[in-house]
From Swiss-Prot:
Coiled coil: none annotated. Disulfide bonds: none annotated. S-adenosyl-L-methionine binds at L76, G108, F127, G128, R129, L130, T131, L132. It holds the Pfam family SPOUT_MTase. This is Ribosomal RNA large subunit methyltransferase H. The gene is rlmH. Specifically methylates the pseudouridine at position 1915 (m3Psi1915) in 23S rRNA. Keywords: Cytoplasm, Methyltransferase, rRNA processing, S-adenosyl-L-methionine, Transferase. Homodimer. It is an enzyme of class 2 (transferase). InterPro entries: Alpha/beta_knot_MTases (IPR029028), RlmH-like (IPR003742), tRNA_m1G_MTases_N (IPR029026). It catalyses: pseudouridine(1915) in 23S rRNA + S-adenosyl-L-methionine = N(3)-methylpseudouridine(1915) in 23S rRNA + S-adenosyl-L-homocysteine + H(+). It is found in: Cytoplasm.
C-alpha cells in the first residue's frame, strides 16, 4: 500500500519531527508512506470570513495539486466520522483488499480544509472533537496508521 499524507505548513518542532520519523521508520515494514508538505498561506491573526475562505482556498489548491487522480482520499476534519483504532484498521485493510493501493490522507492548515478538498475526499474522519494543532495531527495520524497495521496483522502493540 502507498500512503501519502498531504499537509499544510512546514514542521518545525523537533520533538514532532523525531516522533514522526520514528513511526515512518516502523511503517516501512508495512507500507510506503510519504509526507508531502504544501506551503501555508500567510495571513494576519484576525481574518474576516471572506479572508478565511480565501486562505483555505489557496491552501486547498496546493493540496489538490499533490493528490494523485487515482488516490482514495481521506480528509481529517473535525466533522468527520470518529472511529476506534480497530475500525480504522479494518477500513484501511478493506481499502487494500479492494485494490485501493493509493491512499492519501489530507491534513489542513490552522483554518481547516477548503470546500474543494472536502469535495475531493472519499471520506472524512476525525480523531475526536478536540481541536489539535495541525502539526501534532501528523504525529497522531502516523501513529494510528502504524497501530492499524499492527492490529490487522494481529501483532502486539495496540493495547
Amino acid at each position: 500500500m502507498n500512503i501519502q499524507i498531504v499537509t499544510v505548513g512546514k514542521l518545525k518542532e523537533k520533538y514532532l519531527v523525531q516522533g514522526i520519523a520514528e513511526y515512518l521508520k516502523r511503517l516501512g515494514a508495512y507500507a510506503k508512506v510519504t509526507i508531502v508538505e504544501v506551503p501555508d498561506e500567510k495571513a494576519p491573526e484576525v481574518l474576516s470570513d471572506a479572508e478565511m475562505k480565501q486562505v483555505k482556498d489557496k491552501e486547498g489548491a496546493r493540496i489538490l495539486a499533490k493528490i494523485p487522480d487515482d488516490a482514495h482520499v481521506i480528509a481529517l476534519a473535525i466533522d468527520g466520522k470518529m472511529k476506534s483504532s480497530e475500525e480504522f484498521a479494518a477500513d484501511l485493510d478493506k481499502l487494500a483488499t479492494y485494490g485501493k493501493s493509493k491512499v492519501t490522507f489530507v491534513i489542513g492548515g490552522s483554518l481547516g480544509l477548503s470546500e474543494a478538498v472536502l469535495k475531493r475526499s472519499n471520506e472524512r474522519i476525525s480523531f475526536g472533537r478536540l481541536t489539535l494543532p495541525h502539526q501534532l495531527m501528523r504525529l497522531v495520524l502516523v501513529e494510528q496508521v502504524y497501530r492499524a497495521f499492527r492490529i490487522v496483522r494481529g501483532e502486539p502493540y495496540h493495547k
